[in-house]
Amino acid sequence: MSAFTPASEVLLRHSDDFEQSRILFAGDLQDDLPARLDTAASRAHTQQFHHWQVLSRQMGDNARFSLVATADDVADCNTLIYYWPKNKPEAQFQLMNLLSLLPVGTDIFVVGENRSGVRSAEQMLADYAPLNKVDSARRCGLYFGRLEKQPEFDADKFWGEYSVDGLTVKTLPGVFSRDGLDVGSQLLLSTLTPHTKGKVLDVGCGAGVLSVAFARHSPKIRLTLCDVSAPAVEASRATLAANGVEGEVFASNVFSEVKGRFDMIISNPPFHDGMQTSLDAAQTLIRGAVRHLNSGGELRIVANAFLPYPDVLDETFGFHEVIAQTGRFKVYRAIMTRQAKKG
């Protein structure tokens, strides 16, 4: 994480303005500018574990990862630089949380790509920190205002839920498929065999729907779920609890915090990181799976049909199968055999 995003490049045009500021960086922190910008003091808060990993190496305890920021996370800051995400409800959750903690008079900067909908920050913050556009470059907008009134923030009001075949799915802003089960996950679920046993790892678990649906017809599986997203981790825990399913859920950058081996790894891996297309997570998932599968264990993933995963599967496992497909999606299966590279 060394090259700066367009949003950070816009901020750097104003770097002189930040030298005396005590800044809290938050939102979609796609690079390490928070650790490198010359300021009086810098903190960062993120809901993304992989962003925290990068920033904490340089910022130590001044980089925080959690679903909800606390007063300690914003202590002594007089400026907020918020990177607008692609998901408006996610921005609403984060900004209301942060502005409820920061003191009146705090300088508020919001920056983001135009295609992300950053313009809607003006309306969102109109009652609390009226914004004006102060720069436009690199297809991004930079907005500035001053906090005039702290909003009230109640994280519980942001929870949502929906039902899938009698299962209750709990969701939060920023969680994949927040409003219903996506088509890719439906296809993957259709391939899971009832009465399966053994240890199952759900990587990129989102709201936990794959795991609870699997556990309903295979109650003897032992579930472990992980995701980079703090909202996803909390949503999965809530989904498991709502359906009486046991499982361990934790934050992890693909396999970074995963220990041990499993009989099956399932995933609907992301191919976007913020506004950017990225195949890194899925390729890391495929290549790293061999270090976390028992002999005879399998990796089963669903992906958009156009994504170039077959080559990586063959390179890693020696072969793969397509066990279900539609015009848009394919479910891939690869077995841990002696042919597989041991990582």
From Swiss-Prot:
MF GO annotations: 16S rRNA (guanine(1207)-N(2))-methyltransferase activity; nucleic acid binding
Cellular localization per UniProt: Cytoplasm
A Pfam family hit: MTS
One GO cellular component, as annotated: cytoplasm
Primary localization: cytoplasm
UniProt cross-references to InterPro entries, sorted A to Z: DNA_methylase_N6_adenine_CS, Mtase_sm_N, rRNA_ssu_MeTfrase_C, RsmC/RlmG, SAM-dependent_MTases_sf, Small_mtfrase_dom
Reactions that this protein is recorded to catalyse: guanosine(1207) in 16S rRNA + S-adenosyl-L-methionine = N(2)-methylguanosine(1207) in 16S rRNA + S-adenosyl-L-homocysteine + H(+)
Organism: Escherichia coli O17:K52:H18 (strain UMN026 / ExPEC)
Family designation: Belongs to the methyltransferase superfamily. RsmC family.
Keyword check for Phosphoprotein: no
Task performed by this protein: Specifically methylates the guanine in position 1207 of 16S rRNA in the 30S particle.
Lineage: Bacteria, Pseudomonadati, Pseudomonadota, Gammaproteobacteria, Enterobacterales
Key words, A-Z: Cytoplasm, Methyltransferase, rRNA processing, S-adenosyl-L-methionine, Transferase
Subunit architecture: Monomer.
Protein name: Ribosomal RNA small subunit methyltransferase C
Enzyme nomenclature, EC number: 2.1.1.172
Top EC class, one word: transferase
